[in-house]
Structure formats: C-alpha cells, structure tokens
C-alpha cells in the first residue's frame, strides 16, 4: 500500500486561508483572480442596485486591504460587478427588524463625523457590505470560513450602530470571544478599525469587582470585549443588565448549543428575552454552525441549525457561491499519509511493556493502601485517580509514540507539574505515589533499551524503528524531513492529548534529522500545567510568528481563536474528533499551496471512513443551510432558576455548579485542605431516576444537600447545586447578588444606623483631611469690660523648681466660670534643660473682683506680656501705643487672664500684683517721645545714661532692655557698681568692654565710666511638656546665664518686668496648653457620660491620654491605650459575630470583623459622633500659641481655608515650626488612622477605668454593635452536642486531665480538635472556635503585658505580644500538651508534618525559633486557640477562668529568657547601629522565592541568598544567615532593646484588665439529656428516599425579643422533663446519632378556610439499622405547626419503643 495518497476533495473556498504578501507567487495568483473577477458576474447577495445603494462605494476603483481576521483583499473595479446579489439563508426563522438601525451611518449620521477618521467601509468586500446590511436589519449569524473576514463585518456593524452607544447613550456594545487570546486579538482589530473606546475584560486583566466600577466602565467605553464567562457572571450578579447592551456579538457562536452549559447558551437562555422591547441586536460569527458528533447526522443536522437560530434568535446567512471568495482565500491541499500496522513481534513487545506498567501500577496501589488510614477514603480515591491518569498517559504514549516516547513521557511528567491540579499540595515523598509510579515505570521501560545504545544513537535515522518508535511517529518524521528544506516553512501538528504534545515536541527537538525544525508545544490554560500560563502561551505564539519557532505541537486549543498565521503545513497526528474540529484545524493552513495532512493506519477502515465522513458531513451542512429540510429543533430544556427579586440576581442550575465551587474555594483553606463539594449519585431503579447528594466541606454552614429524583445525573447535580445556592443565600452566606460578601464591602449591620459619610462638607476619611479643633467652652466665656465690676474665678499657679536654682514670680489664672474639679487640681511637671524640672500645681483661690480700670490694666498687661514672649519685634520701635487690639475680643479668642500675684498671710491669701502691672504699663515705650527724660546730664549716682535717655537706677533694675548693636532683649538683674566699660571682659584678662565692643561692633562708648548692667538674655519659649528627662541621670543645678553690657547702648523698654517674671512667663504657654487639652477631654467625658452612665468613673486625665497622639511630643500619648483598646475591640466584635452568625465560616467572620475594626470604618463612625474635634494631634508650637491679647491673625472661612491650609503652599511668615498654620478656626490636618487610633484608645481608657461594661457601652454609642444575649451562649453550647458521637474515638478524660479543666459540654472539646479535612461526622470543624479563641487570647495577652510591664513602649508591647502568641509559640504549647493525639484529620501529609515538627522539637527544644529544621504547622497553634475558644464558651464567657487557664499553660513570662527576636528586625537594628547599607531583592521560580540580601560595610559588600515558600520566609532565612556571617567576620554585638527592657525594666503583678461582666449560666441548661442518645453500631443497608433535605450546622438563632415562645407539650424522658418541642427534640436526636434529619410532609388537608384541619406525617431514616424507615402520622390539628408537632411526638414515641431512645 502506498505511503501517501491525494484525495480529490473539493474544499469550499470560503473555508480557505490567507495569502502571504511576502511571497512572489502570490502576485501572480492575485492577477489571475482579478482577471476572473472582470470576466464573470458572481451572484453574491440580495438583489439591489449597486449605483443607488447607500452602503456600496461610488463607481470608482477602490483599493481593499487587510482587515477583520487579518485577511488580504484585492483591488476591486466596482463598475464590472453585477448587481445580481444573493444571500444564502433560511426562511424558517422569523425576521427580526429594528427601525432604529435600518440605515448605515457613522455614529448615526449619513455623513461621517470629522472625528470619525477610521471608516471600515472603505476597505470592505462586497459580500461583507451586504452581510453587514442584513445585520442592521435583523439578528444574523454569519457563516463563513476561516479567513473570510467575519470580524470585519462585525466591526462595520459596530460602526453603523455607533449612534446607540455614543454619549449620552448609556448602552454599550459587547463583543464576546471564547478565549483570552481571541479577546485580545479582536479588541485590537476593533480599536484599529473604528474610533470607539474599547476595553478588554478577560482572565489576567484588571478585575472590576463592584457595581459602581462597572457603571463607570460602561460610561467610559463604547465597546467591551470580553470572554462569555465574564458577561454571564456579570448578568447573573447584576453588574451588567441586558437592557444596557445595544449590540451583542458572539464570535465562534457555534458554542451556543441548546442542550449545553456553555456561557453563550446560558446568556441567551436565561437573560435574553425575545419579547422584551429593550433587547440587544444579536450578531453571530462561525465557520461551522453545527458541532458535536451526532449533530451531523441527516436526522439531526437541520434540527441543530434550527436550534442555533432559535437560541440566538437569529438567521444563518452565508454566500451562495464560493467563486466570489476565490480571490480572497486559498484552499489547502488535503492529503492522507498511510502507515502500516505494527508487526506481530513489535506488537508482542508492546503488550509486554503494557503488562509491565500494569504490574507497577498494582504494586503502587497496594503500597498506597498501607499508607492511608481506612477512614481517609477521599484521599485514597484522589490518589487512585491521579495514579490511573499517569498510567493511562504512559500506555497511550507507548502505543502512539513507541517505547522511546513512553520513556520520555514518564520523565517529563516526573520532572514537572504533571498532577498540579488534584494532587495534595504536600511534597512529602510518601504521599507522592504518582512520582513513585513514574520513576519505576521509567526505569522499567528504559530496561528495554540496549545498554550500549546512548541517546544520540537512539535518535539517529537507523534507530527509527519499532518498538522504540511507532510507525505512526516514523511516518510523521518522514513528512517533516521532506518539508524541512522548503523556504519559510511553518507547521502545526494537532494531537488530542497534552502528554502527546509535550512528549512529541521533546522528541522532535532532539532528532538530528529534523534540526531545522524548532519546536514547542501549545496546550490550554486549563491543562493544569504551571508552565503553560497565559504569558507563556503569548510568548510561544510570538516566537512562532517571528519564525524563531517553525513547528508547534498543539492540542485543540490551536484549532480556533488563536492568531496563528502564515502556516504552510497542518498535520493531524491524531484524527479530529468532530467535523467542527476538522474544519477549524484545516482553517489554520492559510498560506497558498499549503497542505493539510492526515496520518491514517492503513489497516484501520474506521479512520478512512471518518475522513470521508468529514467531507460528506460538511457538504451536507452547507446544503442544509441553503435548503432547510425541516423546521424541527432540539427539545428545549428549561432549567430551573433561582432569582432574587430585590436585586434581579439570577442563577441557573448549570451555573449554580460553578457558583458552588466558587463559594467553597472562598472557605478557609490551607495546603492540607482544599475545600470543594463532593457529589454522590444514587440511582433509583424503580423510579428510573437518580438522586444527587452533595457533601459540602466541613467548614461550610450546611453539611449535605440532596436533589429531587430526576431522570439524569446531570439534572440531579444541577438541582442539588441550585438548592445549595438557595440555602446558602437564605443563611446569608451569599448576599442578595448571590455572591460571597467581598472583604472590601463595609459591614453595615454592626452599625446601629446608616450614615451618609459623603455628605460631610469637605471632611471625609481620606488620608489627610482638614478638621476644626475644639476650644474649651470655658475659654470662650467673655467678661464685659464696660461694667463697673467684673468678677473672675481665680487660681493660684504654684511653681516648684527641682532643683531650686531659679526664682519664679507667682502667677494667677483668672476666668469667667469656675474650672471643673479635675482641672482645679491639675498638676504637671515641666521639663527644663539638664534634667531640671518645675512642678506646677493649680489651687482655686475664690473669686476676684476687678473694677473697670483694673480689668483694663489686666488686659493690657497680658497683651504686653504675650508680645514679649511671641512678638518681641513689635517692641523694638521707640514708641508702642498702649491699646488693646479689637481682634482680641472676637468669638474665636480665648478669654482668660494670666497675672502676677502677691501672697499674703503666709501664702494663704493672694491678690493681683497691681504695683508690678502699673509699673510695667508706665514704661517709656508706651509714652510719646516728648515725655522722655533727656535733661539730666551728666548721670548722677542715682541715674544712668541709656540710649533713650537718663533713667533712675531703680527704674533700670529689674526691667527689660534692648541693645541696638546686638539686636537682643535682656532682663536687667542688677547694676554692677564695681565694674564699668574699662573693666576687662570676663574670661579675658586684658581686653576691656570698650575695646571689645569697638572691635566687634565698631561702636565707641561715650560714657565708659558708667557701671555695667548685669543682664540675662530673653530666651525663646519652648514646649516644656516634652519628656527631656533621662532616667539614669540626676537633676543638676544650672547657674543662670548673665552677661555685662554698657548702659548707654541699651534702650529701656519695660520697667518692672524682671527676670523672675520672664521665667514664669516662659512656663505659662505649656501650662495653658495642657489646661486647654484637659478641659476638652473633660468636656468629652461629660458628653459621653450623659449617654453612657457606665463610664462615669473614667477620669478626665485618662480621656486626655486617649485623645493625645504621639505627635504632640508630650509625656502622655494614646498608644498604650490604643493597643489595649484594639485588642478589646477585636475580642468584643469577634464574640458578637460568633454568636450572631452561626452559619458564617471563619474566613467570612474574619472579613466581617475586619470591616468593622478597620481604620476607615472607625474613622467614619468617629466623625459621625464628631469625635475628631476633640483630638489633640499638634505639639505645642510657641509661634502658634494664641490667647487673649495675642489673637490669631489668620482668618479662615470656607473660601480661604484651602489656600491657607494648602499642603503645597510656599513657606511664609505665618509658617509654624511644625509646618502647619493655625487659623482662627483651629483647623488642623488629621489622617483617618489617627482618628481610628483615638477611637481604640478611648475604648482602652474606658476599659481601664470602667471595665468591660463601660467599653461595650461606648462601642454601642459610637455605632459598633457588640451586644449578645445569654440565650445565644446557651444555644452555642447545646449545638455542640452534635459532636458527641465522636467522643468514643478520643479519650476526653485524658485530654481534660492534661488541660486541668473538666468540660461541661464535651461536644465543644471534641469540636476544638476537628480539622476541616475531616468530614465524616456531618460537618463542622474547629475554625469558628479558633476565630473566637484567637480574639480571647489576643486580649488576655495584651492585658497581661499591659499590666506586667507598665513602662513598655507601645511598639514593644505589640512586638512582645506577637512573639508570645505567634504560631511557633503556640505550636510549642500544643506539642508540650500532646494535643496532636486528639486531632481528627484526614490529611496524611498533615500528620507527617506534625510528626516531623514534634520530633524536631523533642531532639532540639531550643531550636524552634530558628529558621533551620522543618516548618511549623499552623494547625498546632490553631488547636491551642480553638481550645481557648471552647473553654470560653463552656464556662459561660467567664474570662477569669480562661485567664487562669492561660496563665497555667502559656505562662508568658516563663520563656522570656528564650525570646527569639525576628532575624529581620535584628538585622535592621544592627545595620542602623553600625550605619551599614542593606539591599534586598526577591525572585520567584517554581512556586518558591529566592531572596538575595546584600550588606555594604566600609566599601565591602557581603551577599547571602536563601529560598523559602514565600518571600517572608526567604527573607527571614537570609537575614539569619547574614547575621551569622557578620558575627563570624566582624567583632560585633547585637543588642535587643526589647530584651533589655524585659530583663531590667519594672515588672508588676499580672492582672486581667476590666473584666466586670456576669458569667452566663450554662450549667443548668434545659434540653436534651445526651446520655439517652444511643450511638448505634453500623449495619449494612440503605433506605432510599427521593425527597430532598438540608442538614444545617451551627447555632440556632436567638428568638426575637418581641415574640414569646408558645407553650408546648413537654416530652417526658428518662432523663427528666424537657421544655423543647417534639419537633426540635427529634431534630437533635437525628443530629446526635448522625442520622439524616426528619422529613415532614402535609398529607391531608380538609375543611373550609376558617375550619381547616391538617394532618402531617414524618419520615425518618434510621441509617444505622438495616433498611429501617419510620413513617409516623399525627392527628388532625387546626394549624400546620401543631400537626407537624403531633407527628413528631409520634416519631419520638416510636423511637423510644423501638429501643433507639431511652
């Protein structure tokens, strides 16, 4: 038989490929086609006049170029084209027309807009124009071959219907393509062809999540190109509505089959309503409208086409004759290459190898059974499936490629991610059974190769024989060797299996004979190969297009959608499975004179018949499209839908499967547990149907869902999944859009009411917003100076310096209203230089009366005193008018007076020092120059000559002077009568003052004989609230700094203003700053106390601490309270969520908690309560201190605020030292984190002073609901009884003895040890208890360290807590208590990891904190937290019990000596201390991170690298390695400040902060006596039932407060009376025995409406008894509830008398 044969097959020209411009012979063929065009008149489309039709170009020669599917058109002479045009279509489908789009136009106008530079009509072909015209009139399916320009028709249609999507329209055009590569390709074509905004949405691109984002996306774009799954998802969940789509284009629309679950079909069946007035225009494109093996049969062909038309509500149109396409596309030559069947001896050899592989597989299965516990059935089945898949792949490659191919396939799979989809994540050799099989198989198969033959010999031409190479593979090699010499040759080989593609590509690349072929493989993204990502696929295609590769071995992913061009040879190594596959793969050969080849076994008649059938079926399909033989369609299967009417979200049975998988994937998981639903199908022969039972993961809120009895397994599966979605939505796990709640959404339910945050004017929670700072109300109360008498409350400010090296003038504080008690006794320490300080105390001194003159003098004195402090430049002129500024009395001013005092009667009576005040105000600077003393000269003994006149010595002494030569102010302390200008300058024995001044300033003294003035410089005011003390130093006396100056160079400014007054004045701004902040804190306390009586005990100073940030640089800040409040907030919210949401998993609980406690939400709630105005976030800046007499000069209003407080403003004279300007409204910048921190700090403050009750009330006041009811705690304990059947598998008594606690509710203890991989008990696991226990432990540890180390900084407090409760620390506790022995788990790998880590700790107990050794399994730490959660519930939320327990087995202080500081942090501190530079970089490869760390010291660079599972682990290892190397090469010591504090710092007794709640009584719970529940032995047999049911797990919801429980008849049992209903008791009995829940059914209903009676029956399967099903009937009752209750009583009676219930 010949090796090849040419088939005389006439291939329709409409399915032929593209021509290459670069080849010269294309030009010759092009000219032939142009001549043929001119010699004949082709019928193309519907009859119309070319001269008058709007869409045809004018009668001129118009050039056509490439467009659409990257095709090449020919120049076209319009005058020679006939007007007899015909369109092939079916008349069986009714026409769809629309008047709004009956005409072609650019953006809806006859003439294109000047902006529409791109007009796709200019390069359109005749048939494209006519098909586009039809598409504007009705829904159309264009049937044209690959390369015929279908995309260009779609582009023209978008252009013509542009008026529907251009602004201000709110609709959009959506272009659907089935693959990501095709989406990107088609989006580029559209963007290049029309001036519309095009957006891409597909896998790997930016994900639009929210409804608002999709609204913006639609508004911003006219065309959206996406995969159909994305559109289906958006329609299902109401992100996009069908009414918003004006044009819907389906590329490769043949996927829309009536009986398929393809997204195309789902979109049309569920969401497209043909009767709707707002429905999109439909346009479909396909090269084969019929798909499927059976669809091409004569009886099904018409039915398939009609069904496609019905589903898309469109007609199929094509060209009638292929002649018109001949000028645009080329037909490949179809050839068949035969190979002979294997010889008998080779066949025997192959059989021998098959048996060898089968024997290896059986041995691996036997070893697998020994490794896996009998209870771990799912793991066993999973590994069996993986093993079978690997075995089938080797057998397949052995038969199709030969022995060498099988060897390569084994090695390829062994060394790659062959089983990445389903294999357990663990890399433990014992669990890698597939690797064991592949290794043994490769070794066994390699034994068949001669030992003296090396790889190069095997790949030589002589070795191309059986059994090493199959005859099929040899034939392929021959074909490629023939074509290898052809220029510009490119080839695609199509195979049906991924393993064939990878192995064949490997073999071809290693054949010396085919070295001119450069090969790679191309498989789908869903293949499960990590190496085949979207990026790698794009890289392969680009390399193929750039001729770097010229051979692709592809699966069916290369048949359609991918932009694979210029291909000359297409080989079907494996025959196509369908006609569609035949047509699509043939369309890849687009080059002229290309070849489409089949490899066929000459002894296999089926293969020859299959090829012949492809052509026959294709011709039959073309004929059927033209002449429809029947109007019959496929039966439409209307799926059941679940719709949420509130939102419009809708899901079908088919889509519910993927939604259920998506929900399960969102459940908490790790490398040991991948949650997914498991399906079991039970055929019911007598009814001829199937029931599907879904078992959900153990951490899902429902355990099992069972479908109704349905005819097929697929229908049953859809029904069960849809019921699961319904139930999950009812439980609130899926929101009203049928989606799991996003972590980005704000959890509104935990706030008491709604709050429109966006309506706050200019004050949001964004980063860095402007807020007004509150001024105390007491400071705003004015006095009226016009009255004859003003009474002010007075307070004595006492200064006590330490040491007593200064004298401070006594001052008083005067204001209109009295201070609160806490403020009256305020005392603070002001820190000076050199460890010195001043203690300040406030004492109330009654009421002081001021007459009219006195109040004016007091006001003037304060103004002058504040000028001296802050605006001394205004005192430089010779004359300063003495009058109070009007701005001092504005509403924004503060009204208090600071005046010097005199003490009388032993300091018990105070009075204002009016002598000093009047003396100061009589100073020369405040008098006109004419009054100055100038006539006394020369100076006498009682007078001194100053620069501004002669003055009495008494006036000069204790005054403020100004020197013109040095521009400085000085306090005159004394007159140096023994020293004058001729005296030597101190510290200089030769130079006199005369010489010194002349040399420095060029000034000659005229009166050098005058005595010198001993003066003290006037210093600048500082923030004295800042902590300047060093704990290891003692305060030291500091001599005051004095200098001597000549009087004649000094200007007398203010008399009587002594240095003692100056010293006191320098303290007052710090004192008043603290007083103002304290008064604000007291005001907030009163506001809160009015609403929350429970916090009345909190002190104002505690509130002030909570309001003061670290930025204020004071000795108090909110940070420690914030750490405490943060821990309590987490605890309180966790407790609330745990009890109120029994159906939510741990991951969703965590997300909801995060939404409550995150900064954005806390900021939002704080602003709602106006808390931001109380926050103190600015340090005292003397340049920004404003008081009465020194008002703020920056007037702020809505217009000026942005300019005044612009963050980008230029620095000016109003700029403060802190970079912020203080305005008249007290605006300052706050960040949302600052506001959130204040909320948490307030929680901590109320916690310390008022306990849990006060903190909880505050949280409720601010809008965080953390309430719960005692009944919810009791219900949680009762619900744990469902785990009691598992108590027989664990020795609970031993566990309780180890924990030193006896549980009242044993089910809680059992639940705390159930890993989510264990799902043989009806569901439930420890994760919810872990969530609760984590929050409890976090608060307890915070309370512990907060009280034990009172001087610990907040950052150190957080670090210490993290180190004490991190995973390794808790895992060590779990190991020490042997908690792993009680773990319920079905993961082999997890058991092995725990065992390895336990053995490691046993051999090296101090190495657990190091990076060496096995990694610490998180499960061990989770067990500790879940135990604490169970204990917390079992003792009724008695935190004292948990505190005692925590101290007993955690003992946080015990291991402080072995505290392991993070090597990352240690390295950072080390580099900072030695000023070394460090650099870090990370790369990811094969799922692992390699971290390179560089440290540069003294010009030398030290580099280390380490690898970890994630970047953090790699960085930790690299840091540890770097520290080791540094210590080895350098003489360095590492210091740990945290360690130093712990060893040397103050340590107090540990206390539980704030717990003052009453424990919940869970001891005397009324309910089911669990001892009377028999756990029966397992019997064989299964009762069958067709009705559906749902098993719920979790806590029962607490009854509404407004509803009273109806009295029910008590069920008397041996254990005592029970107040539960019989129905509830029956449910609990089923749960406790792991039975299915009872099924209640109304079987009889009689009587008129007002006298109706009901009879119920209950069906109960006793699964542990052989085929036992109870069916109990109750008596007639007036209500359904009563009837069901009576039926339940009957069932209880039956169970008791049957011995199942004692």
UniProtKB/Swiss-Prot annotation:
InterPro entries: DEAD/DEAH_box_helicase_dom, Dicer_dimer_sf, Dicer_dimerisation_dom, dsRBD_dom, Helicase_ATP-bd, Helicase_C-like, P-loop_NTPase, PAZ_dom. Its main location: nucleus. It is found in: Nucleus. PROSITE patterns: DICER_DSRBF, DS_RBD, HELICASE_ATP_BIND_1, HELICASE_CTER, PAZ, RNASE_3_1, RNASE_3_2. Residues 1-52, 89-120 are annotated as: Disordered. Residues 1083-1251, 1292-1436 form the RNase III domain. Gene3D superfamilies: 3.30.160.20, Dicer dimerisation domain, P-loop containing nucleotide triphosphate hydrolases, paz domain, Ribonuclease III domain. Residues 932-1054 form the PAZ domain. A motif (DECH box) lies at residues 251-254. GO terms for biological process: defense response to virus; DNA-templated transcription termination; lsiRNA processing; maintenance of shoot apical meristem identity; polarity specification of adaxial/abaxial axis; reproductive structure development; RNAi-mediated antiviral immune response; RNAi-mediated antiviral immunity against RNA virus. Residues 89-105 have a biased composition (Low complexity). ATP binds at residues 144-151. Its cofactor is Mg(2+); Mn(2+). Residues 656-748 form the Dicer dsRNA-binding fold domain. Interacts with DRB4. Belongs to the helicase family. Dicer subfamily. This is Dicer-like protein 4. The gene is DCL4.
